[in-house]
Amino acid sequence: LLTTHENPDGDGLGAECGLYYHLAEQNKEVRIINYSPLPPAYHYLNEDGIFEYYDSKSHDKWIKDIDLVIVFDVGDFLRIRTLVDVIKKYQIKTMNIDHHPHPEQSSFNYNIVDLSAAATGSMVYDYLKVARKSAISKNSLLGIYTAVMTDTGCFRYSNTDNKCHEIAIECLNNGIETHKVYQHIYENSTRSRI
């Protein structure tokens, strides 16, 4: 199970997407289940219907049999809300992957925290570069680009480093239409917002 914090942002969602496609390609049984629904700005990541909104009736039966929950981009375990209760109920091991400091790391069985990483998505990228024998898939790269672009303020913040640009170059070289990612997130509005 892959999940991220309530009211998810581009980094959490992009990291989930990046790792999801890798694991699916390895024939692992994997699902993305989040406490909050997918925000409309990120629907372009969901063309394959990979993002699910947690519902105890439809998910708990599957969750009780899994071996690991990977939690992305959460400074606090409780930010995955009711999923915490399910994880504790079934005593499922948890792995935290994040680039923020964690005062309460003991909530997780495993912690992978890199305070120097610009985004959790860049940590997923680093993992995929080592774990894969073949190139990173375009679907994974789309998620990773989303994570890095949003958490660096479109490459404007001080956390933007060489690796961020290397990731962007790899994404461009593999057909990610970076301008469309920007448009989906920042140039579309709901009717109610207009």
Question: Whereabouts are the PLM-identified features?
Answer:
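Anionic-ligand anchoring segments at beta-strand to alpha-helix junctions in alpha/beta enzyme folds, i.e.
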Residues: 1-65
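A structured phosphate/pyrophosphate-recognition subdomain
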Residues: 1-8, 17-24, 104-194
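Fold-independent oxyanion-binding glycine-rich loops
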Residues: 4-5, 35-36, 56, 68, ...
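Residues at alpha-helix caps and immediate loop-helix transition turns in enzyme cores, especially N-
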Residues: 12-15, 82-83, 160
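Short phosphate-binding/catalytic loops that engage adenosine nucleotides
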Residues: 27-28, 92, 176
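Short alpha-helical
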Residues: 37-40, 78, 119, 163
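A residue-level signal for conserved active-site and pocket-lining positions in enzyme catalytic cores
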Residues: 42, 70, 124
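Active-site cofactor/cluster-binding pocket
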Residues: 50-110
